[in-house]
Amino acid sequence: MKTLTTKAELDAFCFMAQTHPFVTIDTEFLRERTYYSKLCLLQIAVPGDRVDDAVLVDPLSPEMSLEPLYRLFRDTSVVKVFHAARQDLEIFWNDAKVFPTPLFDTQVAAMVCGFGEQVGYETLVRKIVKEQVDKSSRFTDWSRRPLTDAQQKYAIEDVTHLRGVYLFLKGELERTGREAWVVEETQSLTDPEIYDVVPLEAWRRIKTRTSSNKFLAYVRELAAFREFYAQTHNIPRNRVYKDDAMVELASTKPTTNEDLSKSRLLLREARKGEIADGIMNAITLVNAMDPEAYPKLPKTNDKLQVNPALADLLRVLLKAKSE
């Protein structure tokens, strides 16, 4: 198999790919030590059985630029096929503010076709293509070079088998007339708000047992500082402080370093320096805040707006479960 290491090589492959009705794409990345995913490898395949119809792309090569791929993403005549696309899309959006159009997610399509919710790629390959995926390289450090033959084989199979999975699911959707369901549900994956995390909105992800507006104000400001710090330093949120530590801080409301030293859950590194200052500033801000500025949870009796496409998908799932 071929690994593309220059922009010129990727440009030639993407130019060829534009003559095909679809391409299958996957990524390998690392995120354990960073806020943003680090793209380490791309796999792309077009229909066909030739060796050159599927390639690896090395984004870590100094001579590589992904602009040819993003140009392909904008070509609406070529369907871009992914499996469980959300994390892949996040990488592309953060890198270039671009989404592949049109997008086909085989995990969404498989759900509509009765394979179950969030079905894995390995399962679809086994059931549809009748092949076994080698998962021995699943926990590879994809940033290391050179990649072994086994790692390359594992990576390329994530797009070669995907071609058969896509064609089967596409046929099933056409046969049952459910293409529109997949289109609408997949379009939700290309909503920038999913990937652009606004620090002041980060509190909505935190689970707490207390719903008082003032308590939520502490959580909001602490979550906003954590999100901003993690983004600007490109470190995981939990490296700043974990959710349970945040809830503890919202309860104890520390305003001095001595107060912080009494925390049971706060990381030692967070009890001094920039993080400690950020925590105390957040608490002080809420202490002086007008109650009208506190966040408010929606009332439980507010009418829920149900996406009709989602309702249809749920009905399909229920039917599949009962058969």
Task: Give the residues covered by each predicted segment.
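Accessory DNA-binding and partner-docking regions appended to nucleic-acid-acting proteins
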Residues: 149, 169-323
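A short, glycine/Asx- and small/polar-enriched loop/turn
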Residues: 36-38
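N-terminal accessory regions of nucleic-acid-interacting proteins
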Residues: 1-23, 27
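Residues that scaffold, gate, or flank divalent-cation-dependent active/transport sites
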Residues: 31, 40-43
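An active-site-proximal beta-strand-loop segment
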Residues: 27-33
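Active-site-proximal helix-loop-helix substrate-binding element of RNase H-like nuclease domains
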Residues: 3, 43-67, 72-163, 189-193, ...
